Every structure is written in structure tokens, then in C-alpha cells.
Amino acid sequence: MGNVFRCYVEKKPGFAVEAEHLFGELRHTLGLTGLTGVRVLRRYDVEGVDAAVYAAARTTVLSEPQVDDLWDEVMPAPEGEHTLLAVEALPGQYDQRADSCAQCIQMMHGGERPTVRAATVYVLEGTLTAQEAAKARGYLINPVESREAALDKPATLRQDYPVPAAVPVLEGFTALDRAGLEGVLAQYALAMDLADLAFLQAYFRDEEGRDPTLTEVRVVDT
């Protein structure tokens, strides 16, 4: 179940209220007179379920067949001049749409919760200059919570974060003599003087019973 399934969902003509409203805003509020139409599609990437579960979810959780058109993997190529823009939540930003879909799919099949990533794809039909396209992007992307999404499907939705490097410990610090402490001051270019470093040494030796990390020394030194 390592496959990523992708689908695009768009309201059928007569139900595309959001697209019609957005067209009016972009054309009249932003003055994009070259804009001739707007399409709004929801894009879903799903990982962690098998093909049978996905097939059931695509028409029960991800779309409503009565009012939605749905395409698997790729959306129909837009005709004529157009600008394509995909927008997704920033990493770490709560995405209610994706989370709700993941919960519903989990309840539907009774297994582990899948990973769902959602994005909104805008098709801006008509001829837009580079400046007008940038204006539309600025209007559609709130940088506090969203960003422009890649158009290609990822191989996986898993996000691997690098393991932070271990914080170095100043081994033997609490046993250093005066010359050793002077060496620490020079090696790490510390701003504190010898008396301050000796006080820090006594604290870690007598109160903490251990050698400090370099980070702890840097914090005291600032």
C-alpha cells in the first residue's frame, strides 16, 4: 500500500459557484481584463490504502458524483491560453479538508488512517501578462498559511525529517585547571572572562555534577 493515488474533483456546470465568484473578483476587483474564465479543482493525493479502498473513497469521500466531475491521476488539459496554479497548506499548517478526508477514509475501511494531502488547482483562462499572473498569485496565496504547490505527483507523502546532530559535550570541563579554562576561552572565542568561566565550571561541577554542553556554554556567554 505504498502507492500514492491522485484525483482531481471539479464542480459540474451549474454547481461551480466558487469558480464563478472568483472569476468576478479577479476580473473586476483586480482588473484582470484578459481573464475569460476560471476553473477550480480540488486535488487529492492519498497514501496508505489499497486500490479497493481508494476506489470506494473517490466517490464517497473525495467527491459527490451528483455534482462533481472526477479524474484519476491527471486532469484534462485546459484548452486555449491559460495560467495554471496549485495552492496547498504550508508544511505543519493544519489542513482541515485533508484531515477530514483521512478520518472519513479510516472510518470507512476500519484500518489505519491514511495520509491525505489536498491542494486547490486554479485554471485561469485567457491571456494574462506576467504582471497580471503575479497579481493573481498574490491574491490566491496567503503566505501565512499556504504556498504554491508542485504540479507533479510525489512518489510518497511521507515527510522524513533529518535527525538533529548530537550536541557536543565539553568533556572534562569540570576538571580543567586555569590553563585549561583559558584554552576553552580561546578555542570557542567566548566573550566571558576567566572569572565567569570559572564560576560556570564550579556550578556544573558542584550543582549539576556533569560537564556542560557547548550549547549551554554559548547560552550563558550571550
Model-flagged regions — what are they?
Residues 1-222:
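Core nucleic-acid recognition elements
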